[in-house]
Amino acid sequence: MSQVSLVVMGAGESSRFRQGLSIKKQWLRLGETPLWKHVALHLSKQACFDQVIITASPKEVKYMQKQVDFEVIEGGGTRQESLQNALASVKTPWVLVSDVARFDVPSEVISRVIGRLGEAECVAPAIGVSDTVSYQGEYLSRSEVKLIQTPQLSHVESLLLAFRQGDFTDESSAIAKSGGRVLLVEGSERLKKLTHPHELTLLQGFEPPFGGCYGGSGFDVHAFMEGEGLRLAGVNIPAPVTFKAHSDGDVAIHALIDALLGAAGAGDIGEWFPDSDLAYKGVDSTLLLQEVIKFIRGIGFELINADLTIMAQAPKLSPYKEAMERRLGEVMEVSRQRISVKATTTESLGFVGRKEGVAVSAQVVLKLLDWTKHACFNR
């Protein structure tokens, strides 16, 4: 059995990166492969690891697990909390920790780091600086200044003890603070960290995102009961009935959510918002749609088109179609031109024809965000 496990940090919210883009950096695609998966697969082949663990944000755990055979662990609010969650599952005495942001890890760096196993509580790659360095008015010797990189190899027990001392940005600083020995080995200029949108140029030479489209469909029905009106596509419709439902019963948005999740391969509305959860009792479905579209964008998709067909014998919906398109555009933050809402009857056939309820069919088309088209990449 190997003495080392691998942990890939992929749970971050990419707050600095997303100041210019909607996507989280770990979901940038190389072809159809997200960056976190590219990093995990590459690193996993560089040594004989006993375990490979990937940290993920809570809403992405199941989605990431679907794409790999490695163990995916829910991360925390900070990098350190995420790593501590992962360490709880590590069974080996040593762990190699790497960040998705450093996506181009040379094999020789991994060999240098792991090759010094046992010589210190932490082994980390580092590079020197070529610029003159000043700190609080004092000029420092460049030979004494090092930029610490990842991946870093740490003794698990020592690292867990070190984390009790406070919050740290990496393993080496935690172990050094606790009095442990940190050994620095030669790093690489290729280990530059992707943090801001202007650093997309670091991806030059890598495969651009897959340019095809992803289609999804959704279908939902709700029965009527006595009430004071319906809500469809976020628009209030006067009627002597309302929907029997756990939420507000917006059958149009529910079908649309299923279509979005289907196109992304991310489950269905029942998995995301179960009707057994009291938190969704009477909830405004536009809030659910906002959550889903934020997720869809965060994992790297853009909405190209959404097409809804509402089947209702009554009430008459044609006067409200434009308002529905506008409202869906507002909620999803897209142009109304990308949304089509159609209304039809069933010629008095079936439960819809008997005016017992409404059915909605929705289709969407998504595509991957193309980072090669971003202004920051083409500077």
Swiss-Prot record:
Its EC number is 2.7.7.60, 4.6.1.12. One of its GO terms (molecular function) is metal ion binding. 4-CDP-2-C-methyl-D-erythritol 2-phosphate binds at residues 220-222, 246-247, 268-270, 273-277, 344-347, 351, 354. The record marks 16, 25, 246, 345 as: Transition state stabilizer. The record marks 142, 193 as: Positions MEP for the nucleophilic attack. Its cofactor is a divalent metal cation. Coiled coil: none annotated. It catalyses: 2-C-methyl-D-erythritol 4-phosphate + CTP + H(+) = 4-CDP-2-C-methyl-D-erythritol + diphosphate; 4-CDP-2-C-methyl-D-erythritol 2-phosphate = 2-C-methyl-D-erythritol 2,4-cyclic diphosphate + CMP. PROSITE patterns: ISPD, ISPF. GO terms for biological process: isopentenyl diphosphate biosynthetic process, methylerythritol 4-phosphate pathway; terpenoid biosynthetic process. Keywords: Isoprene biosynthesis, Lyase, Metal-binding, Multifunctional enzyme, Nucleotidyltransferase, Transferase. A divalent metal cation binds at residues 220, 222, 254. Pathway: Isoprenoid biosynthesis; isopentenyl diphosphate biosynthesis via DXP pathway; isopentenyl diphosphate from 1-deoxy-D-xylulose 5-phosphate: step 2/6; Isoprenoid biosynthesis; isopentenyl diphosphate biosynthesis via DXP pathway; isopentenyl diphosphate from 1-deoxy-D-xylulose 5-phosphate: step 4/6. The keyword Transcription regulation does not apply. Residues 1-213 are annotated as: 2-C-methyl-D-erythritol 4-phosphate cytidylyltransferase. Residues 214-379 are annotated as: 2-C-methyl-D-erythritol 2,4-cyclodiphosphate synthase. Bifunctional enzyme that catalyzes the formation of 4-diphosphocytidyl-2-C-methyl-D-erythritol from CTP and 2-C-methyl-D-erythritol 4-phosphate (MEP) (IspD), and catalyzes the conversion of 4-diphosphocytidyl-2-C-methyl-D-erythritol 2-phosphate (CDP-ME2P) to 2-C-methyl-D-erythritol 2,4-cyclodiphosphate (ME-CPP) with a corresponding release of cytidine 5-monophosphate (CMP) (IspF). In the N-terminal section; belongs to the IspD/TarI cytidylyltransferase family. IspD subfamily. In the C-terminal section; belongs to the IspF family. HAMAP family: IspDF, IspF. PANTHER family: 2-C-METHYL-D-ERYTHRITOL 2,4-CYCLODIPHOSPHATE SYNTHASE, CHLOROPLASTIC. This is Bifunctional enzyme IspD/IspF. The lineage of its organism: Bacteria, Pseudomonadati, Campylobacterota, Epsilonproteobacteria, Campylobacterales. The gene is ispDF.
